[in-house]
Swiss-Prot record:
It comes from Streptomyces carzinostaticus. The keyword Signal applies. Residues 1-34 form the signal peptide. The lineage of its organism: Bacteria, Bacillati, Actinomycetota, Actinomycetes, Kitasatosporales. Belongs to the neocarzinostatin family. The gene is ncsA. It comes from the Bacteria. One of its GO terms (molecular function) is DNA binding. This is Neocarzinostatin. Keywords: Antibiotic, Antimicrobial, Disulfide bond, DNA-binding, Signal. It holds the Pfam family Neocarzinostat.
Length: 147
């Protein structure tokens, strides 16, 4: 079992990053010449429980560690994440990163403060995969869907 302090830390990073990207929090914007970071998830649709997907990021901060995880919008402005399957990756010198992540059709969701939300069902909730650094910065989350 993962200690609750680790759950709080990891969920907070991914949740804050996802919320900031979706306009729910204000973040520092880099100069206009810098491209916004992007993320891709392959495959992202027609998934089965336990599918291992490839998560890639570009335009990231070189040398920065990112947590990668699955989250869902469970209520207006409320994001619950699955810390049990989180992974980490560090962006290379070009600002690119790639890792694998196991995604779940349903999972025990935790809020950014570590509060247990309850069971999240990705066949009814808007689930996504996201990347976030320690400050909560990262590309927009990528929507995923299950069979």
């Amino acid at each position: 079992m993962v200690p609750i302090s680790i759950i709080r830390n990891r969920v907070a990073k991914v949740a804050v990053g996802s919320a900031a990207v979706l306009g729910l929090a204000v973040g520092f914007q880099t100069p206009a010449v810098a491209a916004a970071p992007t993320a891709t998830v392959t495959p992202s649709s027609g998934l089965s429980d336990g599918t291992v997907v490839k998560v890639a990021g570009a335009g990231l901060q070189a040398g920065t560690a990112y947590d990668v995880g699955q989250c869902a919008w469970v209520d207006t402005g409320v994001l619950a994440c699955n810390p049990a399957d989180f992974s980490s990756v560090t962006a290379d010198a070009n600002g690119s990163a790639s890792t694998s992540l196991t995604v779940r059709r349903s999972f025990e969701g935790f809020l950014f403060d570590g509060t247990r939300w309850g069971t999240v069902d990705c066949t009814t909730a808007a689930c996504q995969v996201g990347l976030s650094d320690a400050a909560g910065n990262g590309p927009e989350g990528v929507a995923i869907s299950f069979n």
